[in-house]
């Protein structure tokens, strides 16, 4: 499966990929998980060396949520209710791991306009709105690259050590554009737990993440 964002894998029941280790197999949330007040299970695929309560940076591509949760339906966008349920699920799961986690949602101006009610009612999140089709991607890449720079400093002798950088990234996305950044963070000892909003994910992004969970979309009534 291909798109403007590169080759994509359908999930969660896709064939095994050559070169993909068991540590990268996809976890699958129940199909109706967005309707349930439960948290996503903490994936065993994350490294054993993580602290029991790692500091978390949680990033959400709201464009991917808006379009991904509409996969398999005649709609091009998810409803406000579906988007809100997804964001609440991710936020609740993140806060369970790190109550002080930094949570950032990025959206293009078109997505922000479509889901303005969700944005204005969303508490505890920082919203970044950018123009253009890849505006949300660029905003999140800046956050990932900033975290990379901080961890590079930690590996340089004689440099002042920054206080409390994130030790785990929870990323809600589908596009391959994030693969390089999370691969670099992984080499610096910062794993990424990828949450996929929908049925497909770019192959490069899937293989770069340490753990993958598919969220929805919810089954449609017949």
Walk through the language-model features, giving the residues of each.
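Domain-level signal for Mg2+-assisted phosphodiester chemistry and nucleotide/NA-binding surfaces
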Residues: 2-14, 18-136, 145, 191
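Nuclease catalytic cores that cleave nucleic-acid phosphodiester bonds
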Residues: 110-222
